[in-house]
């Protein structure tokens, strides 16, 4: 019996020696992350283009760092960024474009915008108010709400409430609006200007909307 146990022990030892050793110190596998393609923004004759590896970016969205901030751009089939006409729309007006079934607004520098803006679908069409959500998508419900409150001859209280705190206000002399018995007042916000008629006398608080437009 002792001899059998001894033989068994020897066989077990041989198996242990022959078995491969697996430890935490296995040979490391090098994993190299794919290099991120660098996008370069260039301005040519007033138009913005994006290049990657020397080729124009076309029919695509890109987020590009300009200065210390990052902005969203969309480049059309010719590689041109959608952008508003500064001469017609000013610095805050936007060009409204449809991309894959959704509408977005772009300023004169090609930046996609958010929030309330004055804009139009072309440089020569009549501007109107547009509201874009946190993702830059046109919000029809909020847009209608702002447009209804901003109708000419309506009480200015509602649109002023929606617009919130203004940056500055200016009051002119006699107005030509309505019966002319009052003053023209312009409230300036970040991207919007609200023009109202302020009656004289006891009705001075009952301002009337003249117009709402993008801030030039």
Model-predicted regions and their roles:
Residues 1-3:
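N-terminal secretory signal peptides that target proteins for export/translocation
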